[in-house]
Curated annotation (Swiss-Prot):
Belongs to the ScpA family. PANTHER family: SEGREGATION AND CONDENSATION PROTEIN A. The keyword Translocase does not apply. It holds the Pfam family SMC_ScpA. It comes from Exiguobacterium sp. (strain ATCC BAA-1283 / AT1b). This is Segregation and condensation protein A. One of its GO terms (biological process) is DNA replication. One of its GO terms (cellular component) is cytoplasm. Gene3D superfamilies: 6.10.250.2410. Component of a cohesin-like complex composed of ScpA, ScpB and the Smc homodimer, in which ScpA and ScpB bind to the head domain of Smc. The presence of the three proteins is required for the association of the complex with DNA. It is found in: Cytoplasm. The keyword Cell division applies.
Amino acid sequence: MEAYNVKIDTFEGPLDLLLHLIGKMEIDIVDISVAEVTDQYVGYIRTMQKFELDVASEYLVMAATLLQLKSKQLLPPVPVEDEEVPDFSEEPTREGLIRQLIEYKAYKEAVVFMREQEEHRLELYTRPGEDLTTYMSEEVSKYDGPLNFSDLLHAYSKMIERKRWKERRKKTIKREERTLEEQMTRLHEHVSSTRQTSFFAFFVERPNVSDLVVTFMALLELIKLRIVETKQLDQDIQISFIEASKKGDEAVAVL
């Protein structure tokens, strides 16, 4: 039997290992031989145990499943009487295994694609918007009113892009981790003392992307609890926090 030099923690799970073995056999997923892939898989697990490497229980469960599928194919079906027809709906099938492998492969390819897109996007920098009010007609009305979740998310996304760009230029990043409750209290105290503040002015002070995420979640929770409200100011994307004065007022942010 072929010796394996790949460590089991290289794979993210039994399906990942199965895809690796199928790839080595150079066959399509739908054309797999259950008996052959079972022998390959069990041989791999036994090699790991031979070298006293820890084998996660999920790998052993998959090995048992493959052996059950192999035995069903090799052994003749057991005849049963009509009145005692068992329910095999929960038993594993070759078709079910193939479906899981196809779905997992599609998931892996999607993850790789999204990571490539993220790396590509981080190499780009969007220049901050300029003040174009001097070029606008006086007849254009300025919007000053409630915001919905999409508006907040758009402004938040712009802050994330800027923060990631700055972090990539730093050799070391000091992370100051805060819980959601701590950030809600901090944001509430800030709004209570200043009565209102600029969205960008407040968020730009966050030390890293992780803190930005927690701060944005804290903002959404305070809006949901009707402690603060948000408004669009003129033609800018800025958002102000205003402490809600009446709990019975109509919600100003749609979550």
